[in-house]
């Protein structure tokens, strides 16, 4: 029986590397938010995460662009056959992003899907590096060339991208159209890449001031904590979610 939930630092590899039978999850660039001591100025950048299909090998010469013939569902299924990038960081980290991708054997042209968790510049500032990728930015899904397709994503209806891979609607921080990526069955359990639904471990003192809809964001946070074993936040290190068992009256 599940009881109270708490969060704690995740000890282990940096960057986070969690693998499953279907996907690996790698934090390429860890986000940060650092007060600058001048009024409310903050220097910040968002976390960038790579979701890599198991057994994927770079071969852009044989790559086929996702097709619109079968609608959004088919196009998304085709897009997740290659590397998936969750957020891109700000344009000021362009070189760092390219270098981090290269360390994983991924070139910009290899990326088949970019998921932007929300529309802030520190999270989608490098979309221009991936003109050949399908884009799911907030709730907008488009194929290369700007063909937009409806898909039906909402809080009660996730997008199923593949076995153990989903996109959830998690509104709040940036308004009503934020999304998170859920990867199930990894070596660390269920990993949820959340954008700024969680800024960092221990953000309880600050997230509401940064939220466009705190009520919706609280709902999103609770939903994520109910399933996640590891959370990848927008501006800090990944952290673990611990569910404490509640003893029954018979114990």
Swiss-Prot record:
Binding site for Zn(2+) 1: 118, 120, 173, 196
Catalytic activity: a ribonucleotidyl-ribonucleotide-RNA + H2O = a 3'-end ribonucleotide-RNA + a 5'-end 5'-phospho-ribonucleoside-RNA + H(+)
Any one GO molecular-function label of the UniProt entry: RNA endonuclease activity
Residues given in the record as Zn(2+) 2 binding sites: 122-123, 196, 235
Cofactor(s) required for function per UniProt: Zn(2+)
Domain of life: Eukaryota
EC number: 3.1.27.-
Cofactor binding, per record: Binds 2 Zn(2+) ions per subunit.
GO cellular component terms given for this protein: cytoplasm; cytosol; nucleus
Compartments it resides in: Cytoplasm, Cytosol; Nucleus
One Gene Ontology term from the biological process aspect of the record: mRNA 3'-end processing
Keywords: Cytoplasm, Hydrolase, Metal-binding, Nucleus, Zinc
InterPro entries reported for this sequence: MBLAC1, Metallo-B-lactamas, RibonucZ/Hydroxyglut_hydro
Matching Pfam families: Lactamase_B
Keyword Ribosomal protein: no
Free-text domain note: Contains four of the five characteristic MBL-fold metal-binding motifs, with two waters completing metal coordination.
Function in brief: Endoribonuclease that catalyzes the hydrolysis of histone-coding pre-mRNA 3'-end. Involved in histone pre-mRNA processing during the S-phase of the cell cycle, which is required for entering/progressing through S-phase. Cleaves histone pre-mRNA at a major and a minor cleavage site after the 5'-ACCCA-3' and the 5'-ACCCACA-3' sequence, respectively, and located downstream of the stem-loop. May require the presence of the HDE element located at the histone pre-RNA 3'-end to avoid non-specific cleavage.
Family statement: Belongs to the metallo-beta-lactamase superfamily. Glyoxalase II family.
Subunit structure: Homodimer.
Protein's name according to its UniProt entry: Metallo-beta-lactamase domain-containing protein 1
Originating species: Rattus norvegicus (Rat)
Gene from which this protein is expressed: Mblac1
